[in-house]
């Protein structure tokens, strides 16, 4: 894990060969939905392990079968709220919760409109009460323009003031990171890799395509109303 010097509190895992191997499989257009979902779960899990290194720890007395000694617990691991941005973040959240098994979970449905406005529509928000000792982790695989996460952070912060706000993603574009840090300077960001740029349609380059579609299949879009005149 390394800090990106362009921003405060932004970290990538481009120095981790294992995480880069998982990311390579996710980028490959020949990777099918099953392997893609499994890759997102693995990334969530291993990135969660790394995030625990930034959390407060506490020494505790314990007794082994042979003698008394001292152990360590990751104290902050017990005060985590994971916010899942539907639908692409579901496998990523599954990996995170394997490490943060005490976490309370919130669900947000937010979708980004088409270029050039990229307007964000939020249709569903279920967030638990946030406490002062909490670390709030927002899982969203693709951090492109940053518009979705800015809107989600605006909403989540209404539910209480947390100790930390952390974004976990697979890929991020520099444009999106800059916008998020300008809107929410207190937010830390952990991503597998920071890619080159966005294209005119708001997709990350070189990227990996639409994470939701690749994980769950491309949805049917009825441009002229519901099927069969329903």
From Swiss-Prot:
Keywords for this protein: Allosteric enzyme, Glycosyltransferase, GTP-binding, Magnesium, Nucleotide-binding, Transferase
GO biological process, one term: UMP salvage
GO cellular component: cytoplasm; ribose phosphate diphosphokinase complex
Binding residue positions for uracil: 204, 209-211
Cofactors (names): Mg(2+)
Residues noted as binding 5-phospho-alpha-D-ribose 1-diphosphate in the record, renumbered to the chain: 87, 112, 140-148, 210
EC number, as in UniProt: 2.4.2.9
Pathway info: Pyrimidine metabolism; UMP biosynthesis via salvage pathway; UMP from uracil: step 1/1
Record's catalysed reaction(s): UMP + diphosphate = 5-phospho-alpha-D-ribose 1-diphosphate + uracil
Residues annotated as binding GTP: 38-42
GO molecular function per UniProt: GTP binding; magnesium ion binding; ribose phosphate diphosphokinase activity; uracil phosphoribosyltransferase activity
Family listed: Belongs to the UPRTase family.
Function noted in UniProt: Catalyzes the conversion of uracil and 5-phospho-alpha-D-ribose 1-diphosphate (PRPP) to UMP and diphosphate.
Name the record gives this protein: Uracil phosphoribosyltransferase
Organism: Thermococcus kodakarensis (strain ATCC BAA-918 / JCM 12380 / KOD1) (Pyrococcus kodakaraensis (strain KOD1))
